[in-house]
Amino acid sequence: CLGVLQHTPNTLDSIKELNRVLKRGGFLIIDHYKHHIGHYLSLYLVYWYLIKNLPKSIQAKVTNFLTRAFFPIHWHFRKNKIIQYILRRISPISFYYGIFELSKEQHFEWSMLDTHDKNTDYYKRHYTTKKFNSLLKQNFNFASCKVYERGNGLECIAIK
């Protein structure tokens, strides 16, 4: 169940329901946004608050417009670490150059998708690795459970 939990009203309740329908010996693979100090040192939450409060009928148009406007700037300065550092603090888009080996077109598509995803979600929860591990250990008795920091946050592979 990837890319879903952070978009539900309650992460713990959602994992409990997944666990309820999981057979013994079955794999539970989930992910969740990770808490990152950068969320508070950028305009990320400001953009999110403004965009999520727009009518749903125009949210995609707004995030697509922002991606089309900011992506060329990010791409032009993609190899300049200082400007990228600044852009990542003021730009509303997701940009993954240097993280994933993708073509320019693929980078644009990922930016378009993730810019919409991060700016229009109704619920905004992030976990630290420690708190996510604690949530899982205190509430579940998995035969095996491991949390990894990768992707866009935290990934968990557990066996019931």
Give the positions of each predicted feature:
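A short SAM/SAH-binding and catalytic strip from SAM-dependent methyltransferases
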Residues: 1-9
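Short catalytic/ligand-binding loop motif for oxyanion handling, primarily in non-cytosolic enzymes
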Residues: 8, 36-41, 154-156
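Conserved class I S-adenosyl-L-methionine
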Residues: 27-74
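Long, low-complexity, polar/charged, intrinsically disordered or flexibly structured peripheral segments
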Residues: 91-98
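C-terminal lobe and adjacent flexible extensions of AdoMet/dcAdoMet transferase-like proteins
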Residues: 100-160
